[in-house]
Regions:
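TPR alpha-solenoid repeat register
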Residues: 60-64, 185, 219
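Alpha/beta-hydrolase-fold serine-hydrolase catalytic core, especially in secreted/extracellular enzymes
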Residues: 2-170
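Start-of-helix register in tetratricopeptide repeats
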Residues: 26, 150, 184, 218-219
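Canonical positions in the second alpha-helix
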Residues: 51, 174-175, 208-209
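Canonical tetratricopeptide repeat
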Residues: 64-67, 188, 222-223
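TPR/Sel1-like alpha-solenoid repeat signature
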Residues: 159, 171, 186-193, 205
Length: 243
């Protein structure tokens, strides 16, 4: 809201309020300097350059410009900028690899084994890198987030109506390698495994769904996808032990 007010004043769509402009400028400058003091020099410099554009014609911007120049001339800024460029290149390679490997899953009548795709997608390496501090860790986490949303939601959304259950099962299995705490994904995996006749695996997936808090009693009792499991003792035990 404050930014919109400044832009409106800058464009002449609102009467200028010198007191408000001074207060907002001082607050934004203090925020940027605090970020720099905490070591976030890339973000601080970007905020200061944005201040130059936002306050141009409204306020003397020399303090913001000088602070940005000072930060950008420092070794820490150059180091972080180099790290950011490396991380962006890493992320681009990662997303390109994901697109290539997932295209194989989408186009195949018989999907590759889950463990094979997990290896070529480098899920283990991405998970390890996502735990690192700094830009590399953030880039790896973004790659994992993109991969997870594709596997857990978008691919099944397209493939389930086409009854491509084998492909959907692989999608959910890979999604659970990225993040294994979503009860709905485990439940959906149990359903497609049951539809594929993989009953033992289906019960195991259902157990994980319940373990992570799946509690839709009506769906568990009526979902036709699970009908092939209902006479099994291990299924009955799961239902009996459910909270």
């Amino acid at each position: 809201v404050e930014w919109m007010e400044l832009i409106a004043m800058q464009r002449g769509k609102r009467e200028r309020d010198p007191g408000l402009i001074d207060a907002l400028y001082a607050k934004d400058l203090a925020r940027a300097k605090m970020l720099a003091a905490e070591g976030h020099v890339l973000v601080a410099a970007r905020r200061l350059r944005e201040m130059e554009r936002t306050y141009e014609g409204l306020h003397d911007i020399s303090a913001a410009r000088e602070a940005a120049d000072r930060i950008e001339s420092g070794d820490r800024f150059r180091t972080q900028k180099k790290q950011l460029r490396r991380a962006m290149a890493y992320e681009a390679r990662c997303l390109e690899r994901q697109n290539s490997e997932l295209a194989i899953l989408r186009s195949s009548d018989v999907p590759p084994p889950t463990h094979q795709l997990a290896g070529t997608l480098q899920i283990r390496n991405l998970t390890r890198n996502a735990a690192k501090p700094g830009e590399e860790g953030l880039a790896a986490q973004r790659c994992l987030n993109s991969l997870y949303s594709t596997l857990a939601f978008y691919f099944p959304l397209v493939d389930l109506p086409k009854k491509r259950y084998a492909q959907v099962a692989v999608s959910y299995e890979l999604a659970n390698m990225v993040r294994d705490d979503n009860p709905v994904v485990w439940y959906n995996l149990a359903c497609v495994r049951a539809l594929l006749g993989r009953k033992n695996d289906a019960v195991r997936a259902l157990a994980r769904a319940l373990e992570h808090g799946f509690n839709n009693s009506e769906l568990l009792a009526t979902d036709a996808d699970l009908d092939s499991l209902r006479k099994r003792e291990d299924f009955k035990v799961l239902m009996a032990e459910r909270p």
